[in-house]
């Protein structure tokens, strides 16, 4: 009978921390996207449940060379906190690329998505920010804000961080958390423009539906990673920022034209709908250029891709096998 491995969130937290291995597997996944006609990644399936302020995204991708591929179900029900439940959860199923049989059921409640999303921020900063970037500004005060800062420390010599959020109390609470994790200076800002001034890297991690980062605030040499715009209605960057940037890079141009910050610049008439831009995987692979000057303003528009899910699920399964983690289930 077919046997699968079942891993809980607690087990996955122990074996898949946000570390350099998570960054590398994410980087390799993006690089695979640069190989013509190799990766198979269908469009994101999205189901809206408006009566409950809910949405469900399903992502998947097949990457040649990996033994399995993941299918991720990622719900977000944003009224849940009112009844004492988390707003997001989810799970991944890893299937064999050879037989299609289920290899693992990863009951991560969104944890692996958090890790791979933060790892993507590290990959973007590694390939697009100044190599000596040391001052980071994070917009947002949730889990991803905390993880994005940790991810940046894996690839850049961060020595100072600023946190801005629309809820100042949440920003201050996050700063107190972060001070326990990092030894460098971390402060909460009550002015987003001041938070951006002098920063080398700016990461936006919010579900905003109107711009929170204004184009005129951007300074020469800065890198911006926009993480939050993974649906048509979400928008963190002033559309003019895309037009102003010296370098704009998408995780998937097909997706960012429909979901990301690029989508809003197109709708505003600032960017042609068929304008060509490099994808992050192409920059990693060296087939397209990213930053070429220290003074370049660079923007990475990350909407989240199925290759990231397959990559992190594969890493989780490998580590579970190595450490005999999880439970075996015969179907």
UniProtKB/Swiss-Prot annotation:
This is Uncharacterized cyclodeaminase y4tK. GO terms for cellular component: cytoplasm. Gene3D superfamilies: NAD(P)-binding Rossmann-like Domain, ornithine cyclodeaminase, domain 1. Keywords: Lyase, NAD, Plasmid. NCBIfam families: ectoine_eutC, PRK08291.1. GO terms for molecular function: lyase activity. The keyword Lyase applies. Its EC number is 4.3.1.-. It is an enzyme of class 4 (lyase). Belongs to the ornithine cyclodeaminase/mu-crystallin family. The keyword NAD applies. It comes from the Bacteria. It holds the Pfam family OCD_Mu_crystall. It comes from Sinorhizobium fredii (strain NBRC 101917 / NGR234).
């Amino acid at each position: 009978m077919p046997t699968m491995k079942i891993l809980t969130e607690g087990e996955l937290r122990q074996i898949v921390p946000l570390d350099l291995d998570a960054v590398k597997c994410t980087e390799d996944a993006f690089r695979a996207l640069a190989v013509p006609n190799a990766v198979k990644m269908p469009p994101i399936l999205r189901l809206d449940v408006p009566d409950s302020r809910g949405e469900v995204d399903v992502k998947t991708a097949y990457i040649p060379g990996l033994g399995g591929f993941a299918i991720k179900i990622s719900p977000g029900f944003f009224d849940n906190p009112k009844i004492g439940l988390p707003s997001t959860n989810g799970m991944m199923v890893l299937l064999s690329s050879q037989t299609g049989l289920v290899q693992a059921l990863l009951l991560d409640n969104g944890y692996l998505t958090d890790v791979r999303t933060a790892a993507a921020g590290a990959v973007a900063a590694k390939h697009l920010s100044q190599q000596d970037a040391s001052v980071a500004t994070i917009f947002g005060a949730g889990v991803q804000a905390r993880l994005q800062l940790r991810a940046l420390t894996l690839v850049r010599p961060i020595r100072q961080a600023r946190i801005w959020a629309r809820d100042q109390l949440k920003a201050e609470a996050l700063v107190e958390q972060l001070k326990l994790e990092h030894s460098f200076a971390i402060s909460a800002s009550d002015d987003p423009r001041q938070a951006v001034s002098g920063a080398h890297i700016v990461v936006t991690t919010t579900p905003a539906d109107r711009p929170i980062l204004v184009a005129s605030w951007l300074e020469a040499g800065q890198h911006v990673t926009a993480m939050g715009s993974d649906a048509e209605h979400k928008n963190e960057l002033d559309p003019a920022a895309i037009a102003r940037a010296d370098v704009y890079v998408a995780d998937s141009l097909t997706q960012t034209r429909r979901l990301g910050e690029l989508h809003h610049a197109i709708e505003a008439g600032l960017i042609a709908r068929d304008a060509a831009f490099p994808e992050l995987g192409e920059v990693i692979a060296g087939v397209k250029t990213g930053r070429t000057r220290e003074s370049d303003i660079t923007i990475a528009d990350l909407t989240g891709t199925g290759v990231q899910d397959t990559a992190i699920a594969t890493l989780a399964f490998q580590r579970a096998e190595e450490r005999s983690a999880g439970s075996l289930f015969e179907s």
